[in-house]
Amino acid sequence: MNTTPDGRPIPPAHADERTMLEAWLDFHRATLAVKCSGLKDDQLRLAAAAPSSMTLLGLVQHMAEVERNWFQRVFAGQNVPPVFGESNHDGFALKSGRGLDEAVAAWQAEVSRGRELIADAGLDDSGHLSEQEAGHVGDQGVSLRWIMVHMIEEYARHNGHADLIREQIDGTTGA
């Protein structure tokens, strides 16, 4: 597999649908990790710009929760609590004692668990939405294909946020 100079896996130009979806999802996961690399704890906690309180550390925590929600709760139908506790259901809230290492470990654990849950599933296999989520896309559930495309979109959107936050912190752009 080819990688970018910063170590992110380059998605193949030609592959079957499943391989392509997994590769793009992994590329965007790696992009978030790159955006957080080389920074000190206080930098990871810097908010983007008022009135937003979004931080790079909060984005990592949020994506851990997003991974858990879509692969464990929706696709596998598991009843699992929020990664960082009930009071932080979306993952954005920061805790003074939790730094990047702990947040990344939780995020990577959720990524690994998601991979396990979908390893033998087909792209047309369906997950089940909560009533709140069903209101957005309908009550027929969503296919694994839909979930993977949504996850790519979720990472791409938040990587754009991460790009702006990182540039504000130390001027680093790209990736």
From Swiss-Prot:
InterPro entries xref list: DinB/YfiT-like, MST-like
Signal peptide residues on this chain, from the entry's feature table: none
Keywords in alphabetical order: Transposable element
Pfam families from the UniProt entry: MST
Positions of disulphide bridges: none
Domain of life of the native organism: Bacteria
Record's protein name: Mini-circle uncharacterized 19.1 kDa protein
Organism of provenance: Streptomyces coelicolor (strain ATCC BAA-471 / A3(2) / M145)
